[in-house]
């Protein structure tokens, strides 16, 4: 398998591990698997660095991913099989792949041990389309508004993670690099939050593919200018939804996200200014 194809496989593996962490109900298991999803994301970052250094182009194409399972054990077995498919394409003589092999063999061993204890099994309700939110009583209007918001924003955060990762990989400017890292971290938090909320409502879904036109040969300054406008709109959406939803806990979370968008605007304007100064 060539490195470009391997990159696609690693991208898909990151999503499979990440969305498994959202789908599982047990908090301890969720957190354990999420930690490995973040390791898979680091693998992806290192591999993108490797591709750039070797002047090999890459993109964020992916095949359709069928993530729906009925039990925790089905997920554990699924992830073991998916990891094995990736590992067989690594060159263990290269340090980057030796590291990936070490990480993923440990993860497979952990999943194998989890499979040995029936207490770790459990029903998965992330796809039951109940559109309920635990014991919270949401009216129909609130449910509809929250459902639409989660589908739109989960894709948007996934898109931003990939776009900022791509721009970060190709920038030579340390300030821009650090700003992109902050934005990636923020979007990781938001995607985790929205993914878990979708799972709780039984509407979990893998985001659609991010098209090449959004990141390859992109005018980054214009992207950031447009991004400021999008962040302002996102703030308004969060504020409107927080006001519309008849639940204090969810409203407070959305208000928190709204204020996070404020700081995103500050960071993006700082990056725009730096780009202007370097021209």
Region roles according to the model:
Residues 1-279:
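Non-heme di-metal
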């Amino acid at each position: 398998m060539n490195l470009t194809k391997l990159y696609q496989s690693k991208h898909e593996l990151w999503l499979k591990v990440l969305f498994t962490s959202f789908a599982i109900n047990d908090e301890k298991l969720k957190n354990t698997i999420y930690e490995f999803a973040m390791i898979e994301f680091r693998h992806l970052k290192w591999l993108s660095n490797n591709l750039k250094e070797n002047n090999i182009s890459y993109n964020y194409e992916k095949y359709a991913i069928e993530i729906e399972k009925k039990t925790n054990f089905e997920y554990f077995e699924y992830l073991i099989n998916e990891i094995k498919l990736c590992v067989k394409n690594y060159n263990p003589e290269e340090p980057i792949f030796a590291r990936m092999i070490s990480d993923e063999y440990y993860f497979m061993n952990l999943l194998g041990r989890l499979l040995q204890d029936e207490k770790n099994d459990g029903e998965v309700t992330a796809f039951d389309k109940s559109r309920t939110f635990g014991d919270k009583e949401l009216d129909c209007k609130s449910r509809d508004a929250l459902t639409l918001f989660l589908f739109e924003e989960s894709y948007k955060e996934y898109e931003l993670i990939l776009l900022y990762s791509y721009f970060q990989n190709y920038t030579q400017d340390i300030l821009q690099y650090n700003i992109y890292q902050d934005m990636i971290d923020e979007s990781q938090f938001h995607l985790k939050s929205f993914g878990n909320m979708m799972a709780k409502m039984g509407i979990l879904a893998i985001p659609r593919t991010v098209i090449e036109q959004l990141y390859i040969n992109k005018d980054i300054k214009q992207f950031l200018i447009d991004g400021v406008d999008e962040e302002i709109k996102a703030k308004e959406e969060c504020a409107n939804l927080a006001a519309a939803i008849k639940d204090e806990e969810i409203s407070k979370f959305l208000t928190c996200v709204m204020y996070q968008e404020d700081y995103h605007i500050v960071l993006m304007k700082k990056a725009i200014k730096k780009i202007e100064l370097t021209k």
